[in-house]
């Protein structure tokens, strides 16, 4: 086992050969590499699967041994300073390794089909593999310098993936916004790291915690206390930006302009979890500063409520899920601020799998809509144009419904167990925070079921909208950089998630991973036999276009079905009561795993809850969630529209001033949500316009004042020279006499000054 831990640093770089080999292939054999580009999905998945196997073994060893391992290599620069690099293996690391690898593998398999139509397929897998390498390096880092290096690499990969289709102006603006917003937090993180090193003289976590605690408990110097509090806040600012917490949350909804698999991996399960990971890693440092813990809880509860309210009126399905991510990560941050370390990590796990399922489900929905509206994110992601998809994409519908119920906190799905634990802990921390947290649980159920009902219930609304898309627009090609082309396909084709064209070989599979699932499905007379289980893929002619959405292929559906299993059963690892537990059986796996971390935080390791007490406490939260679902069903289910047409109900609804007041309240809430709480507008006016006006003022000062002085001296010399040249008469003797006269005056002045100094 010692050798396993000693060489575990290798797992951070196992996935690195994929981008290197793709780069070498494009350099040495560009034609063959591009022609065989689909095979690169296999090594990407294979290498990450190897990492997952080792991570699972590590997870089991951590449960059995309950210990922390750290290996460090020192690079001595001089006698006073040395850099140390290594890896730290503890429960937090093992949890994040499992999370990154499992979700990463499923997203890579999903992406093989989802991105099959895109000419940037190779570039996509290069970015994804490098991102996985960066995240694995981040969670295994043993000191703050290593964390910062991989932190920046993760940010770079996020920038590249958000801007994957950068020829679209809205995409380039989105990746720039994400980059600049994260730079604010990253700059604070760097200052905090340098400040802590100046105080403690170390970057290593163990040394840092010990020295920091001694400094807080043994030193009454207020200057030091204020400085360490400032450093802790600067460290926390990095987590605020990375995890999209208020007030640096504005980049996350715009980041949805990237491909949907990116949203599932980076902006739901892993990268936004990096901020939570940083706070959890540094919690022994934060916990000795009460002001910072209160600030973490305050930021968390504000983000919980803000994210929920901003999700109310979103029309874009991915942006609605983005605000949901923001709100749920706020719950996790709230738990960390309250000191509920176990509940925070539990919710991080359950939310990651549930939200990854929802994002992959939204990608399946978007692909099915692209068969009708073409490559147009404004249309294919617009829930206003959806509806009635239940009978067209039944498997996606079931998966999406389970993810929605989990996020709403409905038992026995994953998020119920973790969210309920956070809600119960909030009562003992602050009644005000508890009221907000419980209320937001109802709001979460409302806006998530709003998304579900608008998407799957009723009728396909695109046929009832003023939609002016061209008939052939569904068959646009996608350029290398994601730009919509004008090329119309003129050959017979198979409609895959978007397009996969090959007429010569009818046995060509939908994606690389279809090779592993062979089954023939016989369909109608005009349709040929195809290889793929969950759906029937047709060959269509030139002008043929889908009238209704079609279910996605097996490569897209398989990862979703695996995530359904996680959503159903992952909550079992943290069931908080052990009433039926015998001496040889321990149901609460998570608490057993976190024993070393809880010991470091001096928290109680045996927090088993009586099952009757748990059911009593959870009944209230489930009732609130059920009420939110009921309100959403009342407002958005098709039966409501039918009832509204009844004359009697219309008379009652429109009767009296209460209806007018209600409409005004609804409009205010809608405007608040649709305009993102006016926070983006505030930043645009106060920061963007302020910086622009400051730049204009600086430019005016530079051109008018600085350049004016310089140009003024030049103009003065020019005109003085022009005036003087007319004084002389053109005789050289006169010029010599005038020159000698000026020299004589200069000597007299110099001698008088020298004599006055010598007399002193």
Curated annotation (Swiss-Prot):
The chain crosses the membrane at residues 9-29, 39-59, 89-109, 125-145, 147-167, 185-205, 221-241, 260-280, 282-302, 329-349, 356-376, 398-418, 429-449, 556-576, 620-640, 734-754. Disulfide bonds: none annotated. InterPro entries: NADH_UbQ_OxRdtase_chlpt_su5_C, NADHpl_OxRdtase_5_subgr, ND/Mrp_TM, NU5C-like, Proton_antipo_N. Its main location: plastid. Keywords: Chloroplast, Membrane, NAD, NADP, Plastid, Plastoquinone, Quinone, Thylakoid, Translocase, Transmembrane, Transmembrane helix, Transport. It is an enzyme of class 7 (translocase). Its EC number is 7.1.1.-. GO terms for molecular function: NADH dehydrogenase (ubiquinone) activity; quinone binding. It is a multi-pass membrane protein. It is found in: Plastid, Chloroplast thylakoid membrane. GO terms for biological process: ATP synthesis coupled electron transport; electron transport coupled proton transport. Pfam families: Proton_antipo_C, Proton_antipo_M, Proton_antipo_N. It catalyses: a plastoquinone + NADH + (n+1) H(+)(in) = a plastoquinol + NAD(+) + n H(+)(out); a plastoquinone + NADPH + (n+1) H(+)(in) = a plastoquinol + NADP(+) + n H(+)(out). NDH shuttles electrons from NAD(P)H:plastoquinone, via FMN and iron-sulfur (Fe-S) centers, to quinones in the photosynthetic chain and possibly in a chloroplast respiratory chain. The immediate electron acceptor for the enzyme in this species is believed to be plastoquinone. Couples the redox reaction to proton translocation, and thus conserves the redox energy in a proton gradient. Belongs to the complex I subunit 5 family. NCBIfam families: NDH_I_L (TIGR01974), PRK06590.1 (NF005141). PANTHER family: NADH-UBIQUINONE OXIDOREDUCTASE CHAIN 5. This is NAD(P)H-quinone oxidoreductase subunit 5, chloroplastic. It comes from Populus alba. The gene is ndhF.
């Amino acid at each position: 086992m010692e050798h396993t831990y000693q060489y575990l640093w290798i797992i951070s770089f196992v996935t690195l050969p994929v981008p290197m080999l793709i780069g070498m292939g494009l350099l040495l054999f560009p034609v063959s590499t591009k022609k065989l580009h689909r095979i690169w999905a296999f090594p990407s998945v294979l290498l990450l699967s190897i990492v997952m196997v080792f991570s699972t073994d590590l997870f089991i060893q951590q449960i059995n041994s309950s210990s922390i391992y750290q290996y460090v290599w020192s690079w001595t620069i001089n006698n006073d300073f040395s850099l140390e690099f290594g890896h730290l293996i503890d429960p937090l690391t093992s949890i994040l390794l499992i999370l990154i690898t499992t979700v990463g593998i499923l997203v890579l398999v999903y992406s093989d089909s989802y991105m099959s139509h895109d000419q940037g397929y190779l570039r996509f897998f290069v970015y994804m593999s490098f991102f996985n390498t960066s995240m694995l390096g981040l969670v295994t880092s043993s000191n703050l310098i290593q964390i910062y290096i991989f932190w920046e690499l993760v940010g770079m990969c996020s920038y590249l993936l958000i801007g994957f289709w950068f020829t679209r102006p809205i995409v380039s603006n989105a990746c720039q916004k994400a980059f600049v917003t994260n730079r604010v937090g990253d700059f604070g993180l760097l200052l905090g790291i340098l400040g802590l090193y100046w105080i403690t003289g170390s970057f290593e976590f163990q040394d840092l915690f010990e020295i920091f605690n001694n400094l807080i408990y043994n030193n009454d110097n207020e200057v030091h206390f204020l400085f360490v509090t400032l450093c802790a806040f600067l460290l926390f600012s990095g987590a605020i930006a990375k995890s999209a917490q208020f007030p640096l949350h504005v980049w996350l909804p715009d980041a949805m302009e990237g491909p949907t698999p990116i949203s599932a991996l980076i902006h739901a399960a892993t990268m936004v979890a990096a901020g939570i990971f940083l706070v959890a890693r540094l919690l022994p440092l934060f916990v000795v500063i009460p002001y910072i813990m209160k600030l973490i809880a305050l930021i968390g509860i504000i983000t919980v409520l803000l994210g929920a309210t901003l999700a109310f009126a979103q029309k874009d399905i991915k942006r609605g899920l983005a605000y949901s991510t923001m709100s749920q990560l706020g719950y996790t941050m709230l738990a960390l601020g309250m000191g509920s370390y176990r509940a925070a990590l539990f919710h991080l796990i359950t939310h990651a799998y549930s939200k990854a399922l929802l994002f992959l489900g939204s990608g399946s929905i978007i692909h099915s809509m692209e068969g009708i509206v073409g490559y147009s994110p404004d249309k294919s992601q617009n829930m206003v144009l959806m509806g009635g998809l239940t009978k067209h994409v039944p498997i996606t519908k079931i998966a999406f419904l389970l993810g929605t119920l989990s996020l709403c906190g409905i038992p026995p799905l994953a998020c119920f167990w973790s969210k309920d634990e956070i809600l119960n802990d909030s009562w003992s921390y602050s009644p005000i925070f508890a009221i907000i947290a419980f209320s937001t649980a109802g709001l979460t159920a409302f806006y998530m079921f709003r998304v579900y009902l608008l998407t799957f219930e009723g009728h396909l609304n695109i046929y009832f909208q003023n939609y002016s898309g061209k008939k052939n627009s569904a068959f646009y090609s996608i350029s290398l950089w994601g730009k919509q082309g004008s090329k119309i396909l003129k050959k017979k084709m198979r409609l895959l998630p978007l397009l996969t064209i090959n007429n010569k070989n009818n046995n060509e599979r939908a994606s690389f991973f279809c090779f592993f699932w062979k089954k023939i499905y016989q369909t109608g007379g005009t349709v040929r036999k195809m290889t793929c289980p969950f759906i029937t893929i047709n060959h269509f002619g030139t002008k043929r276009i889908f009238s209704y959405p079609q279910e996605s292929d097996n490569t897209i559906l398989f990862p979703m079905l695996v995530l359904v299993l996680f959503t159903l059963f992952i909550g079992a690892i943290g069931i908080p009561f052990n009433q039926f537990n015998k001496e040889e059986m321990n149901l609460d796996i998570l608490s057993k795993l976190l024993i070393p971390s809880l010991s470091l935080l001096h928290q109680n390791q045996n927090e088993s809850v009586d099952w009757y007490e748990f059911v009593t406490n959870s009944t209230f939260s489930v009732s609130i969630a059920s009420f939110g679902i009921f309100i959403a069903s009342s407002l958005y289910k098709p039966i409501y529209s039918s009832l509204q047409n009844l004359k009697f109900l219309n008379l009652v609804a429109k009767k009296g001033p209460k209806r007018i007041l209600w409409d005004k309240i609804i409009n205010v809430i809608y405007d608040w949500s649709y305009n993102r709480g006016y926070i983006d507008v505030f930043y645009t006016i106060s920061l963007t316009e302020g910086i622009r006006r400051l730049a204009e003022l600086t430019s005016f000062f530079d051109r008018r004042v600085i350049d004016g002085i310089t140009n003024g001296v030049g103009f003065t010399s020019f005109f003085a020279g022009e005036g003087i040249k007319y004084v002389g008469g053109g005789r050289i003797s006169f010029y010599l006499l005038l020159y000698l006269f000026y020299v004589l005056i200069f000597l007299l002045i110099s001698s008088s000054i020298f004599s006055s100094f010598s007399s002193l």
